[in-house]
Every structure is written in structure tokens, then in C-alpha cells.
Design a protein with these regions (language model features):
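Conserved N-proximal alpha/beta basic substrate-recognition cap immediately N-terminal to
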Residues: 1-62
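A short, glycine/Asx- and small/polar-enriched loop/turn
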Residues: 2, 77-80, 214-220
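Generic preference for hydrophobic
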Residues: 5, 32, 63, 85, ...
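Active-site nucleotide/adenylate-binding loops and adjacent lid/helix of ATP-dependent enzymes
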Residues: 40-124, 130, 142
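ATP-dependent carboxylate activation and anion-phosphoryl transfer catalytic cores
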Residues: 54, 184-272
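Phosphate-binding site of ATP-dependent enzymes
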Residues: 105-192, 213-220
Length: 272
């Protein structure tokens, strides 16, 4: 039986049945990094995630879920333009591009249809937030039960329409710039929101909370990732900029957290 499972897989599909890996590991008493099946389900469904954080009194942009046939005119829409349109589920900003910000009904219908046609998904439509963008890495101390927040700011260049959008191409081509959050008051605000969102969604061990500012500079929850990539992406960079960790240190920290989180004795892991 393994001491600890590192996995970037949430579930498998067998004969049209979805089998969640962490459910199987829990059944057999095998510790693993990251969150339970329930928490992974909460964050992967962006509609559910926003409902849960709003219920916890955490700010998030007004939103609704739609399919191409749902709204036949602008008056039937529950919130007004400008809006941001993205797939209801999925990572890496898939389905997000320069046309995701919509200012009129025709552009809205076109983007919703595109998401349905290309990704076979409903759209999550929310009030567009024009402010700065942040991501907050979260480390849990499983013994003390405390959370450590590690905010970073993500800066992308303006697109042809003059908007800064962290879209699929920007992530794929590594075009964004990541910097530390040095303003102490802002650091505190981002950390508080991220910790509250992590708890509201049932997170464990580690994760990432994405946040964006509105036009008044008020932070709003955007989405969560409870199975962040362990290569040199945003989670790793949040560790570097906030804790001065190198890659090896980050992996050992995650390993010890994963082992202790299931009430297994913490082991002394030697660096090779």
C-alpha cells in the first residue's frame, strides 16, 4: 500500500460511470495530496463554486448560467452589460479569448453559441470586472489546522481591444508576468478572501483561489483550483515569491502535509 498518492487526475470514466480517484483512496485508507472528491466537485463546477462562496458572504460578481436557446432578447437577461462569458467548467482558461468580454446582445449570443459548439458546455456569464487580477496559493498546516495564503499579481498585456484578459493563449504561451503583492493592506484583503473561499468550498492541503478587482478596487472571488499543477505555474510561483521556496522545498512541504493530514505519522523525508 503506498504511503502517499500524488495525482493530477480527479476522476476516470468507466462505462459512462464517473469514478473519483480520491473516493477510492479514502475507502482504502490511502493518504493523498489535495482535497476530497466533494471539494474537487465544488470547485470544478463554477456555478456551484460561486453559489457556495456567495452563501459564505464572500464577494463574487453577479452571474447566471445560460445555453444558446435560453435568452432570445436582452430584456430577458438578469444582469446588464458589459459581461464576461466563459465555460461553466474546465481549466487553463479554455474557451476564454478576446471575445469573452461582451458589450451587446449579438456578441453575447455569438460567444455562448461558440462555447456550446466548441466545448459542448453551458456558459457562465458574469458582470465584467475590469480591475487587476490575482491568484492566491494556499498551504494548509494539517497538524495546526491553519492556512497560509500566498498572493501574487498576474499581469497580462492588453489585447487588440485594449483589455487585459488571462486567456487560453496567454497561459499556453506563458505571456503573463507574475509579481509579488507588496502592499500590506491589499495582501491582507486578498489573503482573508482566499482563506474564506478555500474553507467555504471544503478545500484541504493546498489549492489556489483566483481573484479579480472591480472598478472600485474591491476584490471578488473568480474561481478555485484545488488540484493546481505542481510544475512551475502559479502555485509554485506563489511559493517562490511569498516563502522563498525552491521547487524541491515545495514538494517536500506538500508531501509532509499530505502524510500528516490523514493522521499518519509525519516522516522524515530526506532530500536526495
Amino acid at each position: 500500500k503506498p504511503d502517499l498518492v500524488f495525482s493530477g487526475v480527479k476522476y476516470f470514466n468507466f462505462n459512462n460511470k464517473k469514478v473519483w480517484l480520491n473516493d477510492c483512496l479514502d475507502t482504502h485508507g490511502i493518504p493523498y495530496i489535495a482535497s476530497s472528491r466533494a471539494a474537487l466537485f465544488n470547485e470544478s463546477d463554477k456555478n456551484l463554486a460561486k453559489k457556495l462562496v456567495l452563501k459564505a458572504k464572500i464577494k463574487s460578481a453577479d452571474f447566471f448560467i445560460t445555453n444558446p436557446e435560453d435568452h432570445q432578447n436582452e430584456s430577458s437577461m438578469p444582469i446588464s452589460f458589459p459581461l464576461f462569458v466563459k465555460p461553466i467548467t474546465g481549466g487553463d482558461s479554455r474557451g476564454v479569448d478576446s471575445s469573452s468580454i461582451v458589450f451587446d446582445f449579438l456578441s453575447f449570443k455569438k460567444k455562448v453559441l461558440e462555447i456550446k459548439t466548441q466545448h459542448n458546455l453551458a456558459s457562465l456569464v458574469e458582470t465584467y470586472l475590469p480591475g487587476k487580477e490575482y491568484s492566491v496559493g494556499i498551504f494548509e498546516d494539517s497538524i495546526k489546522g491553519t492556512l497560509q495564503a500566498m498572493p501574487i499579481e498576474i499581469i497580462v498585456k492588453k489585447n487588440i481591444n485594449g483589455h487585459r484578459i488571462l486567456d487560453f493563449d496567454a497561459k499556453k504561451n506563458d505571456e503573463e508576468k507574475v509579481i509579488a503583492v507588496k502592499d500590506k493592506q491589499l495582501f491582507k484583503k486578498l489573503s482573508i478572501l482566499a482563506k474564506k473561499a478555500f474553507k467555504a468550498l471544503g478545500g484541504k492541503s493546498l489549492g489556489r483561489i483566483d481573484i479579480k478587482m472591480n472598478d472600485l478596487g474591491v476584490p471578488h472571488f473568480m474561481e478555485a483550483n484545488f488540484m493546481p499543477g505542481l510544475r512551475k505555474g502559479y502555485f509554485y510561483r506563489s511559493c517562490v515569491l511569498n516563502l522563498g521556496m525552491n521547487y524541491e522545498d515545495m514538494i517536500f512541504n506538500i508531501t509532509n502535509t499530505g502524510l500528516s493530514s490523514k493522521e499518519f505519522s509525519k516522516i522524515n523525508i530526506r532530500k536526495i
